[in-house]
């Protein structure tokens, strides 16, 4: 059924969507000209958000005196929150507090188009961008005429990240350590040898497989070296004179992985007699088959139906179920939107292929059934609202995962792997920008006064400075959501953004219940807690720690040790009202402050964690089956999107966007380089768009980096799109490689066709698939639930 925007109201539509549908193009309105251009941002990456602030400040400094200044408003809730906020403002025709630009996905353009509020960038020069990455503008419904409505300023794709040490243990166990011999451990702790009936074979006659196996072996050797170093440290503590092997031993890594993964079992339908080839990672069908076989081979996976946070989570982790289903179904349909769930042509969306159970419906059933075997073996981990696979993979709890290339900075553990562990065995990585909360002082040690019974605790912040360590500010969007990761954790993460510079730059913040006493100022040097649950937990922790301290102290010392009763952070952790609570900000902080209670700090050995050099980064599967003719790669990321305001503001909006894309200016080098020499230089000349992508693991789709056949070599020495973070970032390297192939038509780019209903379609298929993973539902139950969530609007 083809649906023309502005003519039909579907009974199942969300309230806001129904209002917009009723208005149609007649809903267009002018905003009040307030003499400024407002950019709405839902960025949760601190690096990207800080870069955007720097860009706006720069524009306001260099613009002509008569040009309108730019200001940023932050919208909570990520891109979904931004979309919802925009829909609300459209529905009430907000003329006074709307915005001119928004960073979001192209379906927002469709929402705007239904009421005539889209703004074409017809005055913006986009000739620097590769046209392949502007093609999505042809697949946006509800716009009145073809044009450029969204400009990709931060592209990413997905990669398949292999955990080298874990995969080595799986394969080595299945093929036997020597010939057909498998070494296992008895309940008494002694080793015993077991003969494998049909060991796994690694097809090293295939050059790709041989190369991949070498990479896997090297990763295990590196992890084995860490295990040996840990042993050496323990021996040194015991005053042993033994030395360790600096070369690294893969068998040492296998022993360490085995502690958590358990013994390999040779079973029918598992890895017994299987031939391993690198090509299994090229397509979804073979990847899921291999994953299912591996899951069947380990009891700690297949027999664990109720996984705790510290358990092995499975073989394969998937961060976006919708992405995986969409790309596999698109690939199964020969990379053709005519064979996809829906398509957009001539400004109209057509869902008939799915609705009429056409090829996309049949392909979805095939894909789902491939997943079903892995689901039944408890071998699939899916992200259910914040628990990203990188959190588990970096602690060797997954064999491999499919993740966004924008997530490089939080995908690996630091030199000191720390996490905050809750009583139920769930955990979050020790967030950056975190300081401990100390119990009220009882002996006048300078931390606080103890005369006020309402004082719950104190924490210390250093003076916040403009420039922060770039490598520690990137990609915070996925941090700390209970069993979720944080980038570069463990690298002295204790402290606020610039803690520990000088003692005399620090400020002690006091936490109170009931009321803040005279002489203290809320939001400056004091916080008032109103949540009774949080108050009780802080008080109980102080009492418990105080009692333990008195028992331990005895006659050893008259100086009381500082008692930690919780932690506070501005990292992007999600409050749950149980252990993580939102509290007031200090000194107008840009990010929400949280208090975390009921946790203990856990430090893991390095051999229990995944380092970046131990990961093998591959493209996410580009085909559904190996016989498919076309290879598919997803392109994703927010676009800069214009919103109609009035004639003057529309012109000023386009002027800013054109400057953002095309005008080279001097930027402070220390803001966008991790190279120490670069940080000593005063400036670096580039466009604002180039400066922005360097803030995180993003790609700007410039023609010059795709059209040059020797792109990698030339770009590494070029001032264009050169980012020290990108060149050392294996995820971005893989993204550049894939995007170059897209620009040459060697592979097909997939992005969601943009319609006002596409967000609901995506959310529906993802949430129902995740529910099917939990319930182990079959395809009929899954698709029935999915269709029910769509209602009558599709």
UniProtKB/Swiss-Prot annotation:
Bias type Low complexity, positions: 220-231
Domain of life of the native organism: Bacteria
Keywords: Cell membrane, Lipoprotein, Membrane, Palmitate, Signal
Residue spans of biased composition, Polar residues class: 177-196, 238-250
Lipidation (N-palmitoyl cysteine): 23
Disordered: annotated segments: 177-208, 220-257, 466-506
Cleaved signal peptide residues: 1-22
InterPro entries per the UniProt record, alphabetical: Lipoprotein_10_C, Mycoplasma_lipoprotein_cen_dom, P68-like
GO-annotated cellular components: plasma membrane
Residues with lipidation of kind S-diacylglycerol cysteine: 23
Localization of this protein: Cell membrane
The family this protein is said to belong to: Belongs to the MG185/MG260 family.
This protein's name: Uncharacterized lipoprotein MPN_284
Membrane topology of this protein: Lipid-anchor
